């Protein structure tokens, strides 16, 4: 092939009509062309399919490696992203679980507090249920005490009323037949002076039925001014004070001459 190229170059040079006096220049040009052809032949020899495949394999390998690296990087990034998403999901799930536990804890605490409240309410109801019974017992006790006091008061009043009735009966009832013959004489007198002397009406009166001997004294300025004594049907004993005047009334019965001065 080299020879063919040289022959073509020679023919090309002869066709151009090179002068026969320049064979050396022609040879130099042929040598240069030969070197160029050699370089081109080396280049063409490099263009062998196996070499070309080798040359192409290197970029393909690099591309494959780069693609593999990029795919690995993408897959690793995808895996990292999925792992991160999984961790995020698991974190959310764990947080939800924790929140669920927290909610369940709160629910349990609320349930416990409700049970505690219900227990306190039950105990309060029990205590309040016992308290009315105690209060009822205490109320029964004061009522009993009050009834005892009332009964005591009533009994005392009844005794005092019976005593008064007895006294009144003794005062109001006539003397028995045995003492009927015994008359009670009351001294009568009126308008007595300071010397306790009767001015008039001095005498004796005999009590009858419920009559009593009565003695009435009137004092003015601390001195006895007027005095009356006799028999009276109604004779309450009393002391009256009015404007410096004092009136004293004394009554007696079943005693002869009880109002005698």
UniProtKB/Swiss-Prot annotation:
This is Acrosomal protein SP-10. GO terms for cellular component: acrosomal vesicle. Residues 75-128 have a biased composition (Basic and acidic residues). Residues 129-147 have a biased composition (Low complexity). Pfam families: UPAR_LY6. The keyword Cytoplasm does not apply. The gene is Acrv1. CDD domains: TFP_LU_ECD_SP10_like. It comes from Mus musculus.
């Amino acid at each position: 092939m080299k020879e063919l190229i040289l022959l073509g170059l020679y023919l090309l040079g002869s066709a151009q009509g090179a002068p026969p006096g320049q064979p050396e220049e022609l040879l130099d040009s042929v040598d240069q062309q030969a070197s160029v052809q050699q370089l081109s032949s080396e280049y063409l020899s490099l263009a062998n399919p196996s070499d070309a495949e080798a040359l192409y394999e290197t970029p393909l390998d690099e591309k494959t490696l780069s693609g593999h690296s990029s795919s690995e990087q993408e897959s690793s990034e995808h895996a990292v992203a999925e792992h991160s998403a999984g961790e995020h999901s698991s974190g959310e799930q764990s947080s939800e679980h924790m929140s669920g536990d927290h909610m369940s804890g709160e629910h349990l605490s609320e349930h416990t507090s409700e049970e505690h409240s219900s227990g306190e309410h039950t105990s309060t109801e029990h205590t309040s249920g016992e308290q009315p019974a105690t209060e009822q017992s205490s109320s029964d006790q004061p009522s009993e005490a009050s009834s005892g006091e009332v009964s005591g008061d009533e009994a005392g009043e009844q005794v005092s009323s019976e005593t008064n009735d007895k006294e009144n009966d003794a005062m109001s009832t006539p003397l028995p037949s045995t003492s009927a013959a015994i008359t009670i004489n009351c001294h009568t007198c009126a308008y007595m002076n300071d010397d306790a002397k009767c001015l008039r009406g001095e005498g004796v009166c005999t009590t009858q039925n419920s009559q009593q001997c009565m003695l009435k004294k009137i004092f003015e300025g601390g001195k006895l001014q007027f005095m009356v004594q006799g028999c009276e049907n109604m004779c309450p004993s009393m002391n009256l004070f009015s404007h410096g005047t004092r009136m004293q009334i004394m009554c007696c019965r079943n005693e002869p001459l009880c109002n005698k001065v």
